[in-house]
C-alpha cells in the first residue's frame, strides 16, 4: 500500500507542516493613538524573533504600554520613537503616510487605518511615497507595483533593518535546516522522481523519469493529483 503524498500530509496539518507559532515573540502592530495627538516611547531593547527575518525593537511608551515594533535602519537602544499625527517625519517614527513627503522611504504600512501594519515587513525592504491626492496616497511597493492607500494609514519611516540577508549564502545545510524549522515547511524537499514508488506516482524505475504523463485531470483522486494539474499546454511556448 502506498503512502500519503506530501501534499496530503500538509493538508492534514500534522506538526511537521505547522509553523511553531508558540515560539514567536509578538504580533507586531502600531500602538493606537488618538487623532491629532502623538505618543512617545523609548527603545529599551533590540531582539530577534523566530517569526521574521528582521530584528524587532522593544519600546516602552509613556502611557505605560510596552510593545514590540519592527526596527528600521538606525534605530538603537535609547532612541525615542514618536507615533501619531503630530510625530516628526524621521527614521523610526510612526506617522500617517499622508504626512510623509514624496520620495521618502517607509515600511510596515497599514492596509486600512489602525490595522497595525500589513505591507513591507521583511528585512532590508522599503516602499516609496510617490504622490499625494486629497483622498489617497500612491506608494511604490518593493515589487514596483503602485498601490493607492488611505492617507490616514500609518507606516514606519525608513528601511526595515537587517538588509543584505539574501546576499549571504547558507554555506551549510544545517544552517538552512534550523532556519526552516521556524517555518511551516518541510525541509529538505526531495524530488518526486527520486522517491520510491510507494511514496509518489513518479517514483521508482532504473533512472529518474516520471514513467507516466505528468499532466493530470482536475478531478484526479488526491493520491494521483500531482504534476501539471489541468494543464492547458506543456513545454516551451512556440
UniProtKB/Swiss-Prot annotation:
The record describes its quaternary structure and partners as:
Part of the 50S ribosomal subunit. Forms a bridge to the 30S subunit in the 70S ribosome.
**One GO CC term of this entry?**
cytosolic large ribosomal subunit
Question: In the UniProt record, does the keyword Lipid biosynthesis occur?
Answer: no
- Its biological function? One of the primary rRNA binding proteins. Required for association of the 30S and 50S subunits to form the 70S ribosome, for tRNA binding and peptide bond formation. It has been suggested to have peptidyltransferase activity; this is somewhat controversial. Makes several contacts with the 16S rRNA in the 70S ribosome.
Membrane-crossing ranges are: none
Region of interest (Disordered), residue spans: 1-22, 202-223
Q: Locate the compositionally biased regions of type Polar residues.
A: 1-11
What disulfide bonds does the UniProt entry report for this chain?
Answer: none
Which NCBIfam families would you find in this protein's record? PRK09612.1
Q: Which family does it belong to?
A: Belongs to the universal ribosomal protein uL2 family.
Keywords of this entry: Ribonucleoprotein, Ribosomal protein, RNA-binding, rRNA-binding
* One Gene Ontology molecular-function label: rRNA binding
Does the record's keyword annotation contain Transcription regulation? Answer: no
Name by which UniProt lists this protein: Large ribosomal subunit protein uL2
The source's domain of life comes to Archaea
**Organism, scientific name:** Methanosarcina mazei (strain ATCC BAA-159 / DSM 3647 / Goe1 / Go1 / JCM 11833 / OCM 88) (Methanosarcina frisia)
Q: Which GO terms describe its biological process?
A: cytoplasmic translation
